[in-house]
Amino acid sequence: MNIDGYTRLAAVVAKPIKHSISPFIHNLAFKETGVNGVYVAWEIPEEDLAVTLENIKRYDMFGINLSMPYKQAVIPYLDSLTDSARLIGAVNTVIHQDGLLIGHNTDGIGFFKSLEKLRGFQVRNKRLTILGGGGASTAIIAQATLDGAKEITIFCRQQSLERTQASLTPIARATGVPMQILALDDSQLLQEHITNSDLLVNGTSVGMDGYSQPVPSTIRFPENLLVADVIYQPFETPLLKLAQSQGNPTINGLGMLLFQAAEAFQSWTGQEMPTDLIWDQLVQKYDIK
């Protein structure tokens, strides 16, 4: 990588963020496409968010990615939002375009692109069961409605039902996609919906510890159900292991990370990220079987 006076900057902004895989992905993309850019990780306190956004314009940056806790906090500092960001109510990508800062959300786009590219799954006219109603789930649900999902059922903890209904009801109303929000502790109802689904998604952090299970181990998966987990460390979560033991196809969150990055990269540079090459590098780097 040759850095000179014309090199433009992009960054991921969060707290914490030093563990991020994003610099590896984007800097490899800059190298392979020949775009004169460099991508870094900025761990900043919340009081520095406003000046960080000002610096995107000041230093003519491509833009930034955002992770927690700044996906909602950034919105007041932006000039406009894309349809997906407005529907989700959160931003993970800021695009610097013609002196304006545009908030975009590529999480849901990246998730379904990973399912399409890596597992041949198309969400149109499919029934989905989603575990959790937090940020990752909301992005996936919103994108599923935009992409033509037939029906979506969300299971969340009893104490989160009211908050989840408040955040997801506007999405259901705006898109007209049938949506139910139910308590996760009703295992019989959970089994019924999983049995009638084409896709099951764990949008929670349950399983990140390597042993916690977001569904009862007695759950039976229908033969052709695709089971997805937004977690990518560990690469095989307890949910994915349970699905594999029943012969179901599975996918973790690493593909989502790659393809949401690809959407951001194209928004900034106008160039397609070489995702096949970068996926091969990720497989090698993290010894993915």
Curated annotation (Swiss-Prot):
PANTHER family referenced in this protein's UniProt entry, alphabetically: BIFUNCTIONAL 3-DEHYDROQUINATE DEHYDRATASE_SHIKIMATE DEHYDROGENASE, CHLOROPLASTIC, SHIKIMATE DEHYDROGENASE
Domain of life: Bacteria
Quaternary structure and interacting proteins, as annotated: Homodimer.
Root EC class: oxidoreductase
Catalytic reactions on record: shikimate + NADP(+) = 3-dehydroshikimate + NADPH + H(+)
Family matches, as InterPro entries: Aminoacid_DH-like_N_sf, NAD(P)-bd_dom_sf, SDH_C, Shikimate_DH, Shikimate_DH-bd_N, Shikimate_DH_fam
NCBIfam families: aroE, PRK00258.2-4
GO BP: amino acid biosynthetic process; aromatic amino acid family biosynthetic process; chorismate biosynthetic process; shikimate metabolic process
Family per record: Belongs to the shikimate dehydrogenase family.
Pfam families in the cross-refs: SDH_C (PF18317), Shikimate_dh_N (PF08501)
EC number(s) given by UniProt: 1.1.1.25
Record carries keyword Ubl conjugation: no
Gene: aroE
GO molecular function: NADP binding; shikimate 3-dehydrogenase (NADP+) activity
Binding-site residues for shikimate, renumbered to this chain: S20, I21, S22, S67, N92, D107, Y232
SUPFAM superfamilies given in the database record: Aminoacid dehydrogenase-like, N-terminal domain (SSF53223), NAD(P)-binding Rossmann-fold domains (SSF51735)
Keyword tags: Amino-acid biosynthesis, Aromatic amino acid biosynthesis, NADP, Oxidoreductase
Pathway: Metabolic intermediate biosynthesis; chorismate biosynthesis; chorismate from D-erythrose 4-phosphate and phosphoenolpyruvate: step 4/7
UniProt cross-references to HAMAP family, sorted A to Z: Shikimate_DH_AroE (MF_00222)
Protein name (database record): Shikimate dehydrogenase (NADP(+))
Chain positions recorded as NADP(+) binding sites: D83, G132, G133, G134, G135, A136, V230, G253
Keyword Flavoprotein: no
